[in-house]
Regions:
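Hydrophobic ligand-binding cavity/cleft-lining segments
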Residues: 1-58, 144
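Short structured motifs
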Residues: 4-5, 16-17, 48-50, 62-64, ...
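Short, solvent-exposed secondary-structure boundary motifs
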Residues: 10-13, 40-46, 66-72, 92-97
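Intrinsic-disorder/low-complexity, polar/charged segments enriched in Ser/Thr/Lys/Arg/Asp/Glu/Gln
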Residues: 14-22, 60-62, 75, 101, ...
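Hydrophobic pocket/interface hotspot
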Residues: 30-34, 40, 63, 80, ...
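Short N-terminal secondary-structure initiator segments
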Residues: 55-75
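Hydrophobic-ligand binding "helix-grip"
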Residues: 68-112, 120
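A conserved amphipathic terminal alpha-helix motif
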Residues: 120-155
Length: 155
């Protein structure tokens, strides 16, 4: 903790990483699966045991999510913002990872679709890295999630 004359400023650890994945499927189809948060519970229940949609307005939705990435388990409130077939952004607006941000950009290429993913994960309290898991393990677990989504896209 950092103490100032106006109070306490909390230090929140930030884990940032980027991933790139090529999927042999049309961008439109890949986007539909990756941004289909309301079916995560059915499509990839090992990562999302429960999803509850709180509100939807246009291309923006507020969703309550239970996310499991290896040893890291989070219950969070997130805002999904979609720009069809190009961009899917997730802003964590509540929970122990509040302030986290995930950006998925979908680029059409001759082989299919390239996904560029930027993850900025903020963890507080007992969730701090490396206590729960190290950054390389977190990247590996997130990559496993991407691999499972890739299988769905390519079938």
């Amino acid at each position: 903790m950092i103490y100032t004359h106006v109070g306490v400023v909390s230090k929140i650890p930030l884990t940032a990483f980027s991933l790139e994945k090529i999927i042999h499927a049309k961008r439109k189809d890949v986007f539909k699966i990756f941004s289909n948060y309301d079916d995560y519970e059915k499509l990839i229940p090992q990562y999302f045991p429960s999803i509850r949609i709180r509100s939807v307005r246009g291309n923006t939705a507020v969703v309550e999510e239970h996310l499991k990435l290896g040893d890291l388990e989070l219950v969070l409130m997130s805002k999904h913002v979609a720009t069809p077939f190009v961009l899917h952004e997730v802003y964590v607006i509540g929970g122990k990872s509040k302030g986290s941000y995930i950006k998925q950009e979908f680029v059409e290429i001759p082989e299919g679709t390239k996904i560029l993913i930027d993850v900025n994960l903020k963890l507080t309290g007992l969730m701090k890295i490396p206590k729960v898991l190290d950054k390389s393990k977190l990247i590996e677990n997130y990559s496993n999630l991407l691999n499972d989504l890739t299988i769905l896209c390519e079938n």
